[in-house]
Amino acid sequence: MKHLTEMVRQHKAGKTNGIYAVCSAHPLVLEAAIRYASANQTPLLIEATSNQVDQFGGYTGMTPADFRGFVCQLADSLNFPQDALILGGDHLGPNRWQNLPAAQAMANADDLIKSYVAAGFKKIHLDCSMSCQDDPIPLTDDIVAERAARLAKVAEETCLEHFGEADLEYVIGTEVPVPGGAHETLSELAVTTPDAARATLEAHRHAFEKQGLNAIWPRIIALVVQPGVEFDHTNVIDYQPAKATXLSQMXENYETLIFEAHSTDYQTPQSLRQLVIDHFAILKVGPALTFALREALFSLAAIEEELVPAKACSGLRQVLENVMLDRPEYWQSHYHGDGNARRLARGYSYSDRVRYYWPDSQIDDAFAHLVRNLADSPIPLPLISQYLPLQYVKVRSGELQPTPRELIINHIQDILAQYHTACEGQ
């Protein structure tokens, strides 16, 4: 399992390649990603965050072992080789337990790391940047690094115990955007300074030395930084290479290190490619994939309304709206404004808080009903042209079967294709 180390080596040798990380637990998104990687014969990096998946189940109800089992079962069913599958853990640290005293939060973080590593996750993002209940705000680089080193030691010991070798690849760094997109309207974003990036690296190197972990430094493959990309509900801050030049050049001084960029969702294909060229060679994508899923489902729901009598329709959109209103905890603190603004945000926001609701049984039943209604007879081509024009072109050329499921998968794969092209290298 050296796909990432090899990618970094090639990038450092001038290939300007990279890898994208699929950050989603939705079965259709994962199927789209696995099938796309299979067709293009590339490894696939799938990541779970500490919010989604933890030793207690996270918000998905899955432990790391459950998540691995779920992904591997899907990969097997699609004949995707498990040795081409890389599993990553994102923001692993005390993130979920910031309301607890630091000692308790870090004890939970130790167990979190053990559970991810024991389950076979090989890319580990150590993130101890968040202040706990009795911590100063913000934490110093030294405290953050000491906590990360403590977790790295736990990870190494767990890996040796379970697999007989220490082959983990680490990502460190703390200057990340708000996970899942910013809450507020944005206009401009500060790029991580080279000095801040160097300070993070040096603090971590020193802390790792104190833990006797010098030998793992070459396996610290990436530093999370902010290259100046972000999105809010209706806007995207596009990558501006000139603002990140000094940061980009800094990466060239490190033999085995590249940068990891979070919240790259909705960047243009040109910006994604330039990010990789500028050494932001691990691109995280999540909400953009579930946004594409939601687009396809809304389009199919509109087609259904044209074809099926109202009383027999799935009512997917209304079911979704009702469930989101009944259980507002995933969007209420994110979406602001009057009733209409919040209604639009629930359905269409780039931050895609609707992704938290797809597992709901009522919504899942409505989804299954929608697919059944549209699978009974062929969808008329003019309606595919009206509501899914990019897929229509592929249907007409014979590349794509016009079934509901294939239309959804292909629409998600249009986003994956942008990331694949950005990461291909020379």
Swiss-Prot record:
Record Pfam families: GatZ_KbaZ-like (PF08013)
> Which InterPro entries did the record assign?
Aldolase_TIM, GatZ/KbaZ-like, GatZ_KbaZ_carbometab, TagBP_ald_KbaZ
State the protein's name: D-tagatose-1,6-bisphosphate aldolase subunit KbaZ
Q: Which organism is it from?
A: Escherichia coli O6:H1 (strain CFT073 / ATCC 700928 / UPEC)
Its annotated pathway?
Carbohydrate metabolism; D-tagatose 6-phosphate degradation; D-glyceraldehyde 3-phosphate and glycerone phosphate from D-tagatose 6-phosphate: step 2/2
Quaternary structure, from the entry: Forms a complex with KbaY.
Cross-referenced HAMAP family:
Tagatose_aldol_KbaZ (MF_01295)
**Any idea what job this protein has?**
Component of the tagatose-1,6-bisphosphate aldolase KbaYZ that is required for full activity and stability of the Y subunit. Could have a chaperone-like function for the proper and stable folding of KbaY. When expressed alone, KbaZ does not show any aldolase activity.
Entry's Gene Ontology BP terms:
carbohydrate metabolic process; D-tagatose 6-phosphate catabolic process; phosphoenolpyruvate-dependent sugar phosphotransferase system
Family assignment from sequence similarity: Belongs to the GatZ/KbaZ family. KbaZ subfamily.
Q: Transmembrane residues, as ranges?
A: none
One GO CC term on file: plasma membrane
